[in-house]
């Protein structure tokens, strides 16, 4: 999963957790980008969310030196 966000266009990024009941409990994570002209919501699986977190942590570590 690749997500590219122009910081000038999107000032607010949020993560929402919604619970849907299908055959059993199913959790859906919604990654929301609020922009001046366009709002984007991406549904992600828990595995993708963990990968995204790890990628963000790696970027933070690279730029913290």
UniProtKB/Swiss-Prot annotation:
It comes from the Bacteria. This is SPbeta prophage-derived uncharacterized protein YopU.
